[in-house]
């Protein structure tokens, strides 16, 4: 079963925020994640496997820091498996990444409120 072993951990912002300037870091994370999720949606609509692969690679490094990269690993395995992934499996994997992206954005905005308007 593809779901076995998947962890649904909440993103962890502690490493990101350890550099200081928390409000700015959270704003940047939110803005960049929103752009990346839009690019992912567009690549999926175009059935652009190369684009999906490039975005997956790009997102993995930042999401690993947040300990939120599990959906990206699922998508990566699908894109790099034998043959062409079926559309339903690909849609499911992309949805997992989009859902995690939405969670990162939501939690980053919640965390951002702790730091006021500065």
Language-model-derived ranges and their functions:
Residues 1-118:
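Two-component system phosphorelay core
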